[in-house]
A protein has these predicted regions:
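Divalent metal-dependent catalytic cores for phosphoryl transfer on phosphate-bearing substrates
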Residues: 27-155
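Long, hydrophobic alpha-helical segments that serve as membrane-spanning/inserting helices
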Residues: 138-141, 146, 150-191
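Short, small-residue-biased leader/transition segments that mark boundaries at the very start
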Residues: 2-7
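Acidic-enriched, low-complexity/disordered segments with a strong bias for Aspartate over Glutamate
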Residues: 9, 24, 39, 124, ...
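Membrane-interfacial segments at transmembrane helix termini in multi-pass membrane proteins
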Residues: 8-31
Length: 191
């Protein structure tokens, strides 16, 4: 019976189902928050920004929000992060298209294969980089803009998005949105 329920849940891919996975009272949301307030904060930012980026391209916003939130879930179990993240998602009966994005975490095991996966990867890389740098570094918006350009251009140059179907125009649209979206990377979010 549990297996049948899990199969049914994995087949649910409606945008409203993804919102259920992001509610404060959802067990894995609570687990991430208990695991690390820093990881929880990071997950919230990646989730929100990924959804905004998907909206700019007319893609699945709530899938990107859910994937952004759970992208680093494997950290709760330790290495190997990707495999552990996929196992947690499978045990929670996440929809297959969400599990696929988690399976493509950082392009480590599998190439990034969808536009939504590329967006989540791009946003996670930028948020991670901005988290690592101190507030002094961002005394001007120019510095923040340069970090975003450099991070995304370096990742793109590796070919990591080549199999995602993301066009150069779409990549540039997302990059420009991230650069111009000062409110998305409010320095008050970084500690």
């Amino acid at each position: 019976r549990q297996r049948q329920m899990c199969i049914r849940d994995r087949q649910r891919t409606g945008e409203e189902h993804y919102l259920e996975l992001l509610k404060d009272n959802y067990p894995l949301v609570r687990s991430i928050r208990r695991f690390s307030e820093m990881d929880y904060s990071h997950a919230l930012r990646v989730s929100e920004i990924s959804g905004e980026c998907a909206g700019k391209l007319g893609l699945k916003e709530n899938l990107c929000r859910a994937a952004g939130f759970y992208y680093r879930i494997g950290r709760m179990e330790g290495e190997p992060y990707t495999e552990n993240g996929v196992l947690l998602a499978q045990n929670a009966c996440f929809p297959e298209e969400l599990i696929q994005i988690l399976r493509e975490y950082n392009g480590e095991l599998m190439a990034i294969s969808t536009k939504e996966s590329a967006i989540v990867h791009m946003v996670d890389k930028v948020v991670t980089k901005l988290d690592l740098l101190d507030k002094e570094t961002f005394s001007t918006t120019w510095n923040q803009d340069m970090v975003i350009y450099q991070t995304l251009n370096e990742n793109s140059a590796t070919g990591i998005y080549d199999e995602s179907g993301l066009s150069m125009n779409q990549f540039l649209t997302i990059r420009d949105f991230l650069v111009k979206g000062d409110h998305l990377f409010d320095s008050n979010n970084r500690e």
